[in-house]
Amino acid sequence: MTEKANGVKSSPANNHNHHAPPAIKASGKDDHRASSRPQSAAADDTSSELQQLAEMDAPQQRRGGFRRIARLVGVLREWAYRNFREEEPRPDSFLERFRGPELHTVTTQQGDGKGDKDGEGKGTKKKFELFVLDPAGDWYYRWLFLIALPVLYNWCLLVARACFSDLQKGYYIVWLVLDYVSDVVYIADLFIRLRTGFLEQGLLVKDTKKLRDNYIHTMQFKLDVASIIPTDLIYFAVGIHNPEVRFNRLLHFARMFEFFDRTETRTSYPNIFRISNLILYILIIIHWNACIYYAISKSIGFGVDTWVYPNITDPEYGYLSREYIYCLYWSTLTLTTIGETPPPVKDEEYLFVIFDFLIGVLIFATIVGNVGSMISNMNATRAEFQAKIDAVKHYMQFRKVSKEMEAKVIRWFDYLWTNKKSVDEREVLKNLPAKLRAEIAINVHLSTLKKVRIFQDCEAGLLVELVLKLRPQVFSPGDYICRKGDIGKEMYIIKEGKLAVVADDGVTQYALLSAGSCFGEISILNIKGSKMGNRRTANIRSLGYSDLFCLSKDDLMEAVTEYPDAKRVLEERGREILMKEGLLDENEVAASMEVDVQEKLEQLETNMDTLYTRFARLLAEYTGAQQKLKQRITVLETKMKQNNEDDSLSDGMNSPEPPAEKP
């Protein structure tokens, strides 16, 4: 009723605000309120402000056109500023209790430490900071993908065009377009690198001078500058069909490797990507080797011996596709050390083949090592899971378990593997810090925790402790989760599957529990006065395979040890639930409260007696210590007096006698 009343009262104000002129600057509270609006409100604001624009423009129809246009531009600029600035999504209040206030992007104050003297300078600096790319962000990754394309194009086609003249001359218009498009991307990448932030003391640096200095003093900057030197001007001297003058474009290779590294960390299938990446590297090496073989054959002379490429005057070997495929075939046979190629004849041919064989051995070793390790990593999870199954099978055979039970266990393992539920979450997340583990657990179990009634008013710290203690469990068809009369030591939350509340015969069904339901939460609290006591009141059985989250009583008690207030809130919440359901014996509660008061009084008396005994012992120790100190002081005073008397006596004996007077 309060929320509805508040909504009714606030609606006129909201309607009034729609007719108010848009403000260019707002106070801090207004900015905060605007930033916390949901994004769905943007459409309403847009339509209302455009309607306002039309209403403001209507009375001006008969006035001058220039004035109407100026007013229109001003309102549009204000509308664009308010609607296109960054807005944060509305946070989940339940989630915020776990996570605390979110850290917004913190801009470091760089340079000489002096701020801008006027607001215009600050606005300009903030506008420039919008173009600083976060190297861990999505836009930077998309740019890496874009820059990797021209790099890969140059590494694959530039050398092929330099070696195969037919490829260069037949499509030189296409190559010119692609070359200069890649040059534009290279130049743009140089400016992007100047606007790419980096972390300093954990914060993203956005100062322009620092970004520029950080990039310029690296080796990569020198390579990037060398890769955009306009060597194409040499075309005027040697001709347009000499693409080898653009070999400096190959120096931009680091961006392609960076894209591959980031993709490997982002992809959900890193092993497959590593294999694909390895195959790409091998294909590029074979491609380059084929081009070099063709270039050597051209320099020696086509068909002069059996090792070089056959004479291109032969129609069978005189067209482009056959030239490239033949060279690629020769390169593949050589680098894979298969052989079966014509032996070299000249010394330079021998040297090239020896070099190829060495490269081939390295490639073969790399392939065997990398592919072997990748396959081992891909099968590591399966091998570990299979080892568990084998151990269980061996145990069941040793203990002569029945075939039906053995088949049931095997089906349970099959269900875990088929539905990807064989991962031990605690083992996987143990390498993460506690904060990240809590964040992941909250994101995974948030919707589940919201359905538990007793956790609605708990402290955020306790909820974080509890969410880390939830353990997933999988039950097979027909398994009993709990039986009537059992002592309740766990509470369960159903993630997937269906459970039935059945009679003692196990057949008659009283109720059906589905995903999102929870049970057993009251029994683990040990609430005094509960008519259920600490025992289960129903039989709950799994109809199929069911995924449940379990929270044990020991884990709950361990968590609430450090949160006594939260424990009291949990017990009060549990009493309210029991009272609503008529399961709380108020007389027993009152009696237990009286017993608690009596126990507290007895405990207080015991504590008072203990304190009195300790005080008396301390007083006796103090009195004894005081007497000892007095005795020591008396002894010291006596010794001091005796020393003073001895000193005065010795001074009298050592003093000279006065001389006798003469008569």
Swiss-Prot record:
GO annotation terms (biological process): calcium ion transport; monoatomic cation transmembrane transport; potassium ion transport; sensory perception of smell; sodium ion transport
Region (C-linker): 380-456
Catalytic activity: Ca(2+)(in) = Ca(2+)(out); Na(+)(in) = Na(+)(out); K(+)(in) = K(+)(out); NH4(+)(in) = NH4(+)(out)
Gene name as annotated: CNGA2
Subunit details: The olfactory cyclic nucleotide-gated channel is an heterotetramer composed of CNGA2, CNGA4 and CNGB1b subunits with 2:1:1 stoichiometry.
Protein name (Swiss-Prot/TrEMBL): Cyclic nucleotide-gated channel alpha-2
UniProt organism field: Bos taurus
Site features described as Central gate, chain residue numbers: F364, V368
Region ranges (Cyclic nucleotide-binding domain): 460-580
InterPro entries for the chain: CLZ_dom (IPR032406), CNG_cation_channel (IPR050866), cNMP-bd_CS (IPR018488), cNMP-bd_dom (IPR000595), cNMP-bd_dom_sf (IPR018490), Ion_trans_dom (IPR005821), RmlC-like_jellyroll (IPR014710)
Family per record: Belongs to the cyclic nucleotide-gated cation channel (TC 1.A.1.5) family. CNGA2 subfamily.
